[in-house]
Amino acid sequence: NKWGGNTGRTMSGGVEIKALDIPKKLFATARLFEEGGSLTIVATALIDTGSRMDELIFQEFKGTGNMELVLDRKLADRRVWPAIDISQSGTRREEKLLPPETLHAVTLLRRTLATMHPVEAMEQLTAKLGKFKSNQEFIDLISGAHVMD
C-alpha cells in the first residue's frame, strides 16, 4: 500500500487499488522480450493463511504465471519427497513445450495420479520412477501401456 499512492480506493482485504501496479509491471516484463531471450521470475506465495489480503494478492498474480508448483504439508510431514501436490501443480500450455507423444503420456499419468490421494500419488510416482534409468524410459512405457499398473 505504501508505494501504490493514495487513491482512497481499496480492494477487499484492505489493499490499495494501485498497490499491485509495480509488481504487475515487473511480472509483465517476462513477456516483453521479443527474439531477445527470456526472463524467468520465481515467486512464492504463502496461502491458506486466513488473511483476505494474502488471498487477494495471490489471486491477482496467479494468472500471470506459466507454472504452478504446489507444495503439500501432509507430504512433508510424512517425509515424502518431493512434497509436491501433483494434481494441483503443472505448466500452462504444455502442448507448446512437449512433443505430442510425450504430452499424451503425461496427460495419462496426470489423470491416473489425480484419482489418488496426494500422498499415495507421490509415493507411487517416485516408486515407479525409481525403477527406470531415465524419465524417457518411463514415458515410453506409459505411451504403450496402462499407467501405474
Where does each model-flagged region fall?
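P-loop NTPase catalytic core
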Residues: N1-D149
